[in-house]
Amino acid sequence: MFLLLIILQALAVAIAQSQGDHKIIGGYRCVRNSQPWQVALQAGPGHRFLCGGVLLSDQWVITAAHCARPILHVALGKHNIRRWEATQQVVRVARQVPHPQYQPQAHDNDLMLLKLQKKVRLGRAVKTISVASSCASPGTPCRVSGWGTIASPIARYPTALQCVNVNIMSEQACHRAYPGIITSGMVCAGVPEGGKDSCQGDSGGPLVCGGQLQGLVSWGMERCAMPGYPGVYANLCNYHSWIQRTMQSN
């Protein structure tokens, strides 16, 4: 029985790892600029879309630690990811600060702060959001946004920013779905019947509950939105002090 549990846990870890540059299914097109804290991370000199992110101040963005790359830019004020837009701003990342206890294989402590090369201009299409200082209770309604695939397992990527409404799941439900893997640095969100989820390409994007940033898209099953397998997010309420301290000291 113990060996079987080890095998099942190892399989679950392998499934989580297989997502790579992870993770909207069952959602809808966001109203233009309704998520003004949403950031698109771009990698390399070619500015290839990589991940989502969230604007915390006029010079700091937060995203998933597994989105780290040697060269990063952030695009803000975006709706259509493939077109130039009058509201957009693109700024190079000057410094990447992953959480010091980030564990890539387990996706634990999967968060990273990005200091921008210059301050961004705040306005109607570009706004900051506060990190939640207290954890959300099970059943709390939340919204996730991103430019990740809208179909799974065969990927189909949108041009416009997508939103999906999900609920915070209980710790028990989260542990049942992923036994032996979930830590205090993670929180699950979804719907019991499945069909609504973040997915590949949404990584680092916001889980917003009650107007506060509660989580970042981190990992999940390779096939998204499956019943009984919610998405897993970095549980930012447990990192509030580290986030504030890091931004103030850098």
From Swiss-Prot:
Name this protein carries in UniProt: Kallikrein-14
GO biological process: epidermis morphogenesis; fertilization; negative regulation of G protein-coupled receptor signaling pathway; positive regulation of G protein-coupled receptor signaling pathway; proteolysis; seminal clot liquefaction
Keyword Disulfide bond on entry: yes
This enzyme's EC code(s): 3.4.21.-
InterPro entries named among the record's database cross-references: Peptidase_S1_PA, Peptidase_S1_PA_chymotrypsin, Peptidase_S1A, Trypsin_dom, TRYPSIN_HIS, TRYPSIN_SER
Root EC class: hydrolase
Gene3D superfamilies: Trypsin-like serine proteases
Domain Peptidase S1 residue range list: 24-248
Places the protein is found: Secreted, Extracellular space
PROSITE patterns: TRYPSIN_DOM, TRYPSIN_HIS, TRYPSIN_SER
Active site: H66 (charge relay system), D110 (charge relay system), S203 (charge relay system)
